[in-house]
């Protein structure tokens, strides 16, 4: 097949980028790499298109060259294409060099036996050293850009095979002196130096003249494959943290350097540092990190070499350089930073973090630096979290958290406040006004007050519990803080029981200092307040988490009172989960009576079976065996008896098991008819399902409880009628329906599964008004229009139209609700919104791109929903 055209390649590249894995698995995937390499030599494709093809090979080398032989062949072809380029200027030389390097590195083909490696490495070194390769290879105008690209390629290869350029250190050092402070060359030399030091230290050898060896003294070429084999562990040039001190002691500290090698090493580091100010901030930070790691723990190499850089960097506004400076401080401590330097740096971080115009990421960075500030002489055990000694409450007064801050900034400031509370514990005992602890208690009270708002955003509740966890983690040893925190959380649950899932999650993650008193407080709160019926499921969920052997009589009394209100399957299961928790806690006689009552009282057969099972287990098993029977199941042991196997299978058949749902449920097209809105549900199954029961729960209190939908049998491939789900909105607003399915399988098992939630849109609630008599439509609409005021509200907006115009839009979305129509420019629309609201629309004087809409409603809450609906009609099509 001949070369592909530009349009064909553009289509293939677009399809590939949309889903690389799917494209490579298709019929064209196998030929993509071969066609790419072939068409790079075609004269029919323009250079920009060829550059796009090379960019693809740089982004997805793993998909194009999945193994070492394919990568070797690709690199060879790319080098051949590079050599065959005409001597005129071309935009392909640099991408070809990068693509060949990427293919070898990503495909694992970089080794001494690779022919492509043997061709690429001398070429890169020749370009990097500025050697004249002849005008037939490239014009003089491209030599400087190609030299910078060669440096980048060599740095990539050194990153992939640490130690590969160990034999080139002397050459790179001489080249740096000749070329000046070129950024890629400086980073290449620093990386190669760091890797050589680490690998030689692990081998217990010195530098062996690597820093002074020139190109002429290299035997067998400049590539140190032996050193690269010893450095098989890929050292990351931008690791997020310094090596541990133990690694240094058994690593770089073991490197034996002769006086001449130590002198040459200091000269090389000084040469790199002296010109580092000419590099970009990111490159400077990387250079400092590499050299700091190279010298940390190395005997005979004083960190004073970095001192001139500190004088320059202490006043920097670049975050990357500030981070590198803190990394140097963590590495060398008081050997490099005096107490005055530490105080200056700490004060600068504190003042910078208080700047009101800082973006949130920058503000969080400064706070992170303060929270993890590396002190010269930290007090306390290693690894213990504490505020810096010089960071007092007066200096941090502007960093105290406030309810007005962003959540992430508030939590970071709260973390700092907790550390200050630990430091200022002694001062609080002396009657200090407005101590950090008092401020902390006021802040937590404000967070709880916002979280207690009924119907408030979930983010406020989440923030409150995140802050509570942070305080419990940082101040676990201070009862003076934990006692009011426990009381405040109990009051929060009393005000808003719907936060029970947050409380359960908090109890699972906090330590015993807060966990035990909070469990007791919440158990007392639940037992003393049975609550209304809608809060009962939250009380039962909380009690299942906090119930234990204490306060048995109060807990059992609450359960007996709650059993009368557990009328549906979900509440009954929640009640039985509490009984299971009490069983595991070893509660005895009173629980047996309760289980017998539940076996007679519960209406659902599944609940009755569970109650009888728990009663039998309680009556026949001792405490340890009962805990094992009710605990999480381990790997199933081999069954030695067929009777045991049969009994286990019988028990499994009686239990309702959770399983992945073989059911797909979706909302079908709506029909505006009847007295209440009805969702038409489309259901599909992947396997036969019998006695299907779909249970729906509305998130929030927007709708009245929904009834279950029953289907006797569903089989895959058979058409099914839509399932009708009547809705009873308490307010005309969209909602999410949580869906749970209970069904039987062909094997006789009863299973339950959670289905994806269904969304009830605002338009799903639309109902038409009764049809007025013929000829009275306009009077009927005007009467409705006038009746909306003064109780309701009126608004006007612009509704954009698609290319089909107003008549098509009304026909598609508003046809059942049109009272008066004068197509194609004017329509009067009346919509009834349950339970007792109305929405009236005047669409008049339509223009080509839109129509002005006047709307009235007798319910203020409907106005923003109606505006969003009308503005989205043209996009809905």
Swiss-Prot record:
GO cellular component, as recorded: AP-type membrane coat adaptor complex
Keyword Cytoplasm: no
Assembly information from the UniProt record: Probably part of the adaptor protein complex 5 (AP-5), a tetramer composed of AP5B1, AP5M1, AP5S1 and AP5Z1. Interacts with ZFYVE26 and SPG11.
The gene coding this protein: AP5B1
GO biological process: endosomal transport; protein transport
Pfam family, one: AP5B1_N
Taxonomy of the source species: Eukaryota, Metazoa, Chordata, Craniata, Vertebrata
Keywords: Protein transport, Transport
Protein's job: As part of AP-5, a probable fifth adaptor protein complex, it may be involved in endosomal transport.
Record protein name field: AP-5 complex subunit beta-1
Keyword hit for Membrane: no
InterPro entries named among the record's database cross-references: AP5B1 (IPR038741), AP5B1_barrel (IPR048980), AP5B1_C (IPR048981), AP5B1_middle (IPR048979), AP5B1_N (IPR048978)
